[in-house]
Amino acid sequence: MQCALYDAGRCRSCQWITQSVNEQLSAKTADLHRLLAGLPVEQWCAPIGGPEQHFRNKAKMVVSGSVEKPLFGMLHRDGTPVDLCGCPLYPASFAPVFSALKPFIARAGLTPYNVARKRGELKYLLLTESQFDGGMMLRFVLRSETKLTQLRAALPWLRAQLPQLRVITANIQPVHMAIMEGETEIYLTDQQALVERFNDVPLWIRPQSFFQTNPTVASRLYATARDWVGQLPVRHMWDLFCGVGGFGLHCATPQMQLTGIEIAPEAIACAKQSAAELGLTRLHFQALDSTQFAIAQGETPDLVLVNPPRRGIGKPLCDYLAQMAPRFIIYSSCNAQTMAQDIRHLPNYRIQRVQLFDMFPHTAHYEVLALLRRSI
């Protein structure tokens, strides 16, 4: 992939950009083999790749510069701003949004936050697009509610310029730290969620719910999990760290009993909405801590699917799963190192199959899906 920002030495986020996609995939596959060394794997499935550019459905932009000439992108450690509007990871549909937002910021009087001086209001712009219908969600991350009245007054102009903006919010992040969002979310539109659709499964995206940033590869990840579960004798399943329910909603059947657990209430609201649309009455989603939920249960499902953050599921949950001994475990991970550590804490399980998904091209990161079967 050619990138003018990289060539000019202004951005180094895509550290592997000089390697071909095939070289990157080979290196990631070798890394996964290294991490799983000593753990018998019955079947290595072929790795799954995707587009090398224009694949991201989300932009996270630091806002700097002045109210008359705002700049969207990132700040180097020395405070130097870099404009990332031309980043080739973003789809072409983002460019007109960035172009319209620059004069809008002046109209609304949203002074960019100055980190060194601790002054200003607008810290970040967070833009998300639905691949399904092109609808977009825009979040203004502000230091306070001081400019809310001006922001509301200027919105009709912005919405006339960009009718694809379906969900607009103001997120309040008052802390002087590099934290992307705060707890308070103020909706500025009637619509509060974007609809996405993977493999004919409706998925909803709300402001504070996690959603994969590479929809092409994510849809294949979910479809693969559905295929694997469909080949197993599963009548009762847990989906832990379930997010908006992508895995559970793909794997569930009308006859299956499924419980999805996620600590973020916004994500659970999305999952419940999708389950209702699909008419799946035996799916139950709850906003709880996944480890605490599992340890408190007295029943054993046929299969437990886990999709934890980068830190993995941790030894307490591993120990409980080993004790509870479901017949199958599916582990989806964005950090194969912690996944390998966790699997080593499950000595009575064997890896039946594993597959790599190149969710993050031009970086060392990747997603991996592993099916574990109880051996005794």
Curated annotation (Swiss-Prot):
A single GO molecular function term of this UniProt record: 4 iron, 4 sulfur cluster binding
Lineage: superkingdom: Bacteria
CDD domains for the chain: AdoMet_MTases
Reactions the enzyme catalyzes: uridine(747) in 23S rRNA + S-adenosyl-L-methionine = 5-methyluridine(747) in 23S rRNA + S-adenosyl-L-homocysteine + H(+)
Chain residues that bind [4Fe-4S] cluster: C3, C11, C14, C87
Binding-site list for S-adenosyl-L-methionine: Q212, F241, E262, N307
Active site: C334
First-tier enzyme category under EC: transferase
Keywords: 4Fe-4S, Iron, Iron-sulfur, Metal-binding, Methyltransferase, rRNA processing, S-adenosyl-L-methionine, Transferase
Known EC number: 2.1.1.189
The UniProt record lists the keyword Nucleotide-binding: no
Keyword Oxidoreductase: no
GO biological process, one term: rRNA base methylation
SUPFAM superfamilies: S-adenosyl-L-methionine-dependent methyltransferases
InterPro entries: 23SrRNA_MeTrfase_RlmC, MeTrfase_TrmA_AS, MeTrfase_TrmA_CS, SAM-dependent_MTases_sf, U5_MeTrfase_fam
Purpose of the protein: Catalyzes the formation of 5-methyl-uridine at position 747 (m5U747) in 23S rRNA.
Protein family per UniProt: Belongs to the class I-like SAM-binding methyltransferase superfamily. RNA M5U methyltransferase family. RlmC subfamily.
Protein name: 23S rRNA (uracil(747)-C(5))-methyltransferase RlmC
Organism: Salmonella paratyphi B (strain ATCC BAA-1250 / SPB7)
Taxonomic lineage of the native organism: Bacteria, Pseudomonadati, Pseudomonadota, Gammaproteobacteria, Enterobacterales
Gene from which this protein is expressed: rlmC
